[in-house]
Every structure is written in C-alpha cells, then in structure tokens.
Amino acid sequence: MKIIAKKDLFINDEIRVREVRLVGLEGEQLGIKPLSEAQSLADAANVDLVLIQPQAVPPVAKLMDYGKFKFEYQKKQKEQRKKQSVVTVKEVRLSPVIDKGDFETKLRNGRKFLEKGNKVKVSIRFKGRMITHKEIGAKVLADFAEATQDIAIIEQRAKMDGRQMFMQLAPISDKK
C-alpha cells in the first residue's frame, strides 16, 4: 500500500463518495458497501474509515486506527532516513611543486577520508606561470591516484577548470 501523506487521504467525514470497496481491520475484503454502512462499521469497531485508493472504481476504503497508522508510517520513514548513507566530498588541495613530505601528509588525509567512505576531490591550483606546466600537475595527480588505487577508484579523470586541475576519487566499496 503506497500512502504518502495526509493530504492524499480522506478520513471519516471527509469521504465524499456513495459507495466504497471496504477492507477490514485485518486486511480482509468486506465487499462493496454504501458509505453510510462503512462508516457505521467503523464507528462500531471504534476505528477510522480511511479512503486509501480514491482513483479505483469503486474507491477503496479501509478500517484502521489512523493515529496508529500515521505513527507507524512516520517511524518507518525515520528509520529509512537513518539507513541512508550521506556521501560527502572532501577536498585535498595540492600544488604542482609539492614537496615529498607534504605530499605524503595530504595523501594520508585523503586515504583517511576514503576509508571513512567519503569521496575525495584532489585539486591542484596553478599560480602565476605554473599554468604553462600542466604536465607537472597531471603527474602529481597521477601519483596520488596510484598511491590510493588499493582503496579507491578514479570517478572523474584529471581535467582542467580555469587555473585548477582536479580529479575525483571514490572508495572501492561504493562501486561493488
């Protein structure tokens, strides 16, 4: 049963049809009933009459405790939101003339991000006349990708964007 929000449902007195296909509390079919009879059955069972499929011919209504149903639905939605993993993109900035020690520090940070399941954007900013030596920047990015190939795959190859060259890495577990 696909029910999205209260605005899609008509409850008790909001229902404006002559007859409904009635579904009982346990999901059993009670047949096609006039609206007045369906509402009296709902009142007798001390539950709500909820129109769950208004487009059907005749519309389908169900006897249910709407408050409990709404609570369960919200609980299920909350649980689904918890299960969703939010992937963030972390950035590691390098320079085309980066020293070995600095490179290893940035590499360590990048590996840490990847191990936590985050994507990593590795960027190199070219300053001044460094832009004429794009191959040096490409080599630095290639070294970074090679050093992380055991835990990451290249999601986006190295490309230039203005005075910046960047590539994006994703943890291998994402693609399996």
UniProtKB/Swiss-Prot annotation:
Alphabetical keyword list: Cytoplasm, Initiation factor, Protein biosynthesis
Gene Ontology terms: cellular component: cytosol; membrane
Highest rank taxon of the organism: Bacteria
Record keyword Nucleotide-binding present: no
Keyword flag Protein biosynthesis: yes
Single GO term (MF): ribosome binding
InterPro entries hit by this protein: T_IF-3_C_sf, T_IF-3_N_sf, Translation_initiation_fac3_CS, Translation_initiation_fac_3, Translation_initiation_fac_3_C, Translation_initiation_fac_3_N
Protein localization: Cytoplasm
GO biological process: ribosome disassembly
Entries under HAMAP family matching the protein: IF_3
Subunit structure: Monomer.
Task performed by this protein: IF-3 binds to the 30S ribosomal subunit and shifts the equilibrium between 70S ribosomes and their 50S and 30S subunits in favor of the free subunits, thus enhancing the availability of 30S subunits on which protein synthesis initiation begins.
Entry-linked PANTHER family: TRANSLATION INITIATION FACTOR IF-3, TRANSLATION INITIATION FACTOR IF-3, MITOCHONDRIAL
Family: Belongs to the IF-3 family.
Protein name as it appears in the record: Translation initiation factor IF-3
Organism (species): Streptococcus equi subsp. zooepidemicus (strain MGCS10565)
